[in-house]
Regions:
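Histidine-anchored nucleotide/phosphate-binding helix
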Residues: 33-45
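Extended, folded domain segments that form the structural surfaces/walls around functional sites
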Residues: 35, 52-54
Length: 172
């Protein structure tokens, strides 16, 4: 295993300007890159609040994300590095689109209606304070990218940090 001293790719902290609230938007297996970011002390040091949205067709597809977030509560290494209760900064917002669950609907639809913001106790994303990372299927990424830009957020890169970034690797 070769470990690099610094993370690379599009979903990295260096591609975002400083902010107060970090949003992770995922569909299906798009949750995976956020697993490492949720274990990264910098995530909790840089943001007052971390909101994770995970939209899947079926309830079972949400299990990985839910288990990971629950496991953070007992992560002794993060607690030692960041401090006890670091996980209280996290708000997890799982939704399904086909199978019945406590929260039904695509996150983009729930944002458009204002329901997601009401549920989470926030307003729409604000470019002065909110930062976002997007990882999902291509159609979702494009739709959410358009939505974030309608809120005034701009896409960033490692060489030009802004308010949001999108995963660019896709499998055929």
């Amino acid at each position: 295993i070769i470990l690099r001293p610094k993370p690379v790719g599009t979903l990295v902290h260096d591609a975002l300007l400083p902010g107060k609230r970090l949003w992770f938007f995922a569909t299906g297996t798009g949750f995976a890159p956020f697993a490492s970011l949720l274990r990264e002390p910098q995530t909790y040091e840089d943001y007052d609040e971390i909101i994770i949205t995970h939209t899947c067709r079926e309830v079972g597809e949400l299990a990985y994300g839910a288990e990971l977030i629950e496991g953070l509560k007992s992560d002794e290494l993060l607690a030692e590095v960041i401090g006890e209760g670091f996980w209280k900064k996290i708000k997890y917002y799982p939704t399904t689109t086909r199978e019945q669950s406590p929260k039904m609907g695509r996150i983009t639809d729930l944002m458009r209606s204002g329901e997601a913001f009401a549920d989470l106790g926030t307003g729409p994303l604000d470019p002065a304070t909110d930062r976002a990372m997007i990882c999902g299927n291509l159609a979702f990424n494009l739709e959410l990218k358009e939505m974030l830009e309608s809120y005034g957020l701009e896409e960033g890169a490692n060489s030009d940090p802004k308010q949001y970034v999108v995963e660019k690797a896709f499998l055929d």
